[in-house]
């Protein structure tokens, strides 16, 4: 099968979050499964700086962005058997960052038009075209409405993956004519209109042949008013083509037996290296080196969406216990300040690292006993899977991908891969935390069994790839 991905970011070239991880990993697994895969990404200045000498020029042409004729260069490289094509236009993409400009609508309108028009020129007409989030969600609409006259594109099947429904691409309806060069018929009849705006995500949901999300629970949640971000009724209407597939993690990169960022390696049969990493981490962050105290890790953006309003409200109570917490992250200044203040009050119990450090993050995943992740909503989440890979048990709010990946501790059977609570409140966070502390202190054999189950969980991309192939084969025979 010929499969083409079009996305706004993709590791290792450009990455701001989970979308970049998916584009970096899923195509590689599909190639291993015997498929021909290509990816189209914007050619950002950070790509030029880091990978420019590995990327070759292929061709160039002009794209009509409404009344404008814009330069479009095509560049190319091959990595892990995947062919990466880059759309080059320095005016749109040499901004020093991926998102956040006033003209993001124009930037990604150009990108989508260029990606579609590039397919014939690079001689890669896919059986299946997979687009991601709002930045590329107009492509299924454009294929069926603007480019339907191109015979080579007639049989292309499309999949839209929603990584985060909060970001929908809502713009003025004038963009249809001014940038995309199409009429207003589909806006006037309500197809593309939402809250009196042009909504790119709605267009993708309605026009894509299939819609996927990054976990089965999130697929159900976005059809409710609580999580649907005002598109729940549209998603319910299209529910027959909506499904959820849990993202994977790179099992080779996140491997406690070979991880180059760790001082000591270990496996599920021998955790002595994990204990040594714990002592090393305690020393590094200025906490007393104690093997007996439970060490809790947090690696996250410090935002309300990640549940840190509830964590801060619970922190004084939690720190009354004989426990240590090491935090790594940045975000809302109020939460940054709160953690810094608590770290001054409880210097032997809390280390607040208001920054981001890849090595320290990896050490936290590997060395801690518990990993705290009480997100208010979480489409998939990767940190809990990384933590489990290293035998660090997640304590999570039972929502979205956290519900699908963390098997809650069952005290009757003594089974599970972590701890979870259903109601996001200080009471239930504290109650679940106490359950975990009791198990750690008084039932080490059960704790050890949970660690083993967590480390044996299969979150590899090769496994996730099989689910995506099932989805693709439902469209392409």
Curated annotation (Swiss-Prot):
Family the entry assigns: Belongs to the glycosyltransferase 1 family. Bacterial/plant glycogen synthase subfamily.
Keyword Glycosyltransferase appears in the UniProt entry: yes
Family matches, as InterPro entries: Glyco_trans_1 (IPR001296), GS/SS (IPR011835), Starch_synth_cat_dom (IPR013534)
Species for this entry: Streptococcus pneumoniae (strain Hungary19A-6)
Catalytic activity: [(1->4)-alpha-D-glucosyl](n) + ADP-alpha-D-glucose = [(1->4)-alpha-D-glucosyl](n+1) + ADP + H(+)
One term of GO molecular function: alpha-1,4-glucan glucosyltransferase (UDP-glucose donor) activity
Record keywords: Glycogen biosynthesis, Glycosyltransferase, Transferase
GO biological process entries: glycogen biosynthetic process
Highest taxon of source: Bacteria
Broad EC category: transferase
Listed name of the protein: Glycogen synthase
Record NCBIfam families: glgA, PRK00654.1-1
The keyword Glycosyltransferase appears for this protein: yes
EC number(s) on file: 2.4.1.21
Pathway note: Glycan biosynthesis; glycogen biosynthesis
Matches recorded under Gene3D superfamilies: Glycogen Phosphorylase B (3.40.50.2000)
């Amino acid at each position: 099968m010929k499969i083409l991905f079009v996305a706004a970011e993709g590791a290792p070239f450009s990455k701001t979050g989970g979308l970049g991880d998916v584009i970096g990993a899923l195509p590689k697994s599909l190639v291993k499964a015997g498929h021909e895969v290509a990816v189209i990404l914007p050619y950002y200045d950070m790509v030029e700086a880091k990978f420019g000498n590995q990327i070759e020029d292929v061709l160039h042409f002009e794209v009509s962005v409404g009344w404008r004729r814009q330069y479009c260069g095509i560049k190319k490289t091959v990595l892990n058997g995947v062919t990466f094509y880059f759309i080059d236009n320095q005016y749109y993409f040499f901004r020093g960052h991926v998102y956040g400009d006033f003209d993001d609508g124009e930037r990604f309108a150009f990108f989508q038009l260029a990606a579609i028009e590039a397919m014939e020129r690079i001689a890669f007409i896919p059986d299946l075209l997979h687009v991601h989030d709002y930045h590329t969600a107009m492509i299924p609409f454009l294929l069926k409405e603007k480019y339907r006259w191109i015979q080579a594109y007639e049989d292309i099947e499309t999949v839209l993956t929603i990584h985060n429904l909060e970001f929908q691409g809502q713009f003025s309806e004038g963009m249809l004519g001014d940038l995309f060069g199409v009429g207003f018929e589909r806006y006037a009849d309500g197809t593309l209109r939402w809250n009196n705006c042009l909504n790119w995500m709605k267009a993708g949901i309605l026009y894509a042949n299939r819609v996927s999300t990054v976990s089965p629970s999130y697929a159900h949640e976005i059809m409710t008013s609580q999580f649907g971000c005002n598109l729940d009724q549209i998603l319910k209407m299209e529910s027959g083509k909506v499904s959820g597939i849990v993202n994977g993690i790179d099992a080779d990169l996140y491997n406690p037996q070979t991880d180059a960022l760790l001082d000591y390696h270990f496996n599920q049969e021998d955790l002595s290296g994990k204990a040594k990493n714990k002592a090393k981490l305690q020393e590094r962050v200025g906490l007393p080196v104690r093997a007996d105290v439970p060490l809790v890790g947090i690696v996250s953006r410090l935002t309300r969406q990640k549940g840190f309003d509830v964590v801060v409200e619970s922190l004084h109570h939690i720190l009354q216990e004989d426990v240590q917490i090491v935090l790594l992250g940045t975000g809302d200044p109020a939460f940054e300040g709160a953690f810094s203040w608590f770290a001054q009050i409880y210097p032997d119990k809390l280390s607040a690292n208001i920054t981001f450090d890849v090595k320290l993050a990896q050490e936290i995943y590997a060395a801690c006993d518990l990993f705290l992740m009480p997100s208010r909503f979480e489409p998939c989440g990767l940190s809990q899977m990384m933590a489990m890979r290293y035998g660090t048990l997640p304590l999570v709010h039972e929502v979205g991908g956290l519900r699908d990946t963390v098997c809650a501790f069952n005290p009757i059977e003594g089974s599970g891969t972590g701890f979870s609570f259903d109601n996001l409140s200080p009471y239930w966070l504290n109650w679940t935390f106490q359950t975990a502390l009791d198990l750690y202190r008084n039932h080490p054999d059960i704790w050890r069994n949970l660690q083993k189950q967590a480390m044996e969980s299969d979150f590899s991309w090769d496994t996730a790839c099989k689910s995506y192939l099932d989805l693709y084969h439902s469209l392409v025979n």
